[in-house]
């Protein structure tokens, strides 16, 4: 099997690091210059909805049960790896859409008096920023 590296093509540091990689590089991100990319990103019932494209065109649409742009990136990475392994998009869709997130990562505990209570153990400034950004958009 060929050596393959998957990286966030929207991240300039990842692209810089890839300059010295001799393996095949497959990119994912929000920009259409990536091998796998998302468009029409919008809030869904509980998380994010978006269309997934690759070099052949529209693969399909995904609806995550978890919010945040960072989770769109995570889903795109999953799609890229699974597609490379020749897993049909419908199988990828079923798996990705059934993922409910890690415990205590933007875990919705319920709604009380019109206020949604969320448990999140984010302990790093980058994680806290992603959590707050996701909360503002849901």
Give the role of each language-model region.
Residues 121-138:
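AMP-binding/adenylate-forming catalytic core of the ANL superfamily
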Residues 1-117, 137:
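Acidic, Mg2+-coordinating active-site environments of NTP-dependent enzymes
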């Amino acid at each position: 099997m060929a050596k393959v590296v998957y990286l966030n093509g929207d991240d300039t540091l990842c692209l810089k690091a890839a300059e010295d990689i001799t393996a095949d590089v497959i990119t994912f991100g929000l920009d259409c210059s990536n091998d796998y990319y998302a468009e029409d990103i919008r809030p869904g019932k509980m998380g994010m909805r978006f269309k997934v494209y690759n070099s052949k065109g529209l693969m399909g649409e995904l609806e995550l049960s978890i919010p945040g742009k960072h989770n769109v990136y995570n889903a795109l990475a999953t799609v890229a790896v699974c597609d490379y392994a020749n897993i049909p998009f419908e199988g990828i869709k079923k798996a990705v859409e059934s993922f409910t997130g890690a415990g205590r990562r933007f875990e919705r505990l319920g709604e009380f008096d019109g206020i949604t209570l969320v448990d999140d153990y984010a302990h790093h400034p980058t994680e806290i920023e992603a959590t707050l950004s996701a909360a503002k958009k849901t």
